[in-house]
Amino acid sequence: MKKKCKIGDKIPKFKIPLSDGNLLDSKDIKDKKYILYFYPKDNTPGCTTEAKDFTNKIKEFKKLNTQVIGISKDSLETHNKFINKQGLKILLASDESGKVLEKFGVWVEKNMYGRKYMGIQRATFLINEESKIEYIWEKVKVKGHVEDVINKIKSS
């Protein structure tokens, strides 16, 4: 088990594909704030709500010079179907191998109805202009989350 990222840590090194055809390279995460939000699965109720909430506030994030990127294990094909079906205005990154999830400490053992399995813990990371983790929301509850993120960016 990898150690979890902490506030103040430099982000781990990684490269994963983005829904717009580009590559998300950790070395390029600088010079503005980034929201990297990790979510379990495209086209599921909580994940759809979270993606739409980020989309609905995208203009506000742009005013705050902040790039929003959602990350899950879904394929780029699934991401693009999700984006088109839901009218999303955010980028999604595909981590099919789960290596980035592990580096950020969000690939965890879960327990549902007594059954243990590995899955993504919904979490959001605020990354500052120096590529350091400024804030972490763990075990995110979707309702009101995007407003919390915006308020944190405004106060930082």
Indicate where each model-derived feature is located.
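Chalcogenol-based redox active-site neighborhoods
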Residues: 1-156
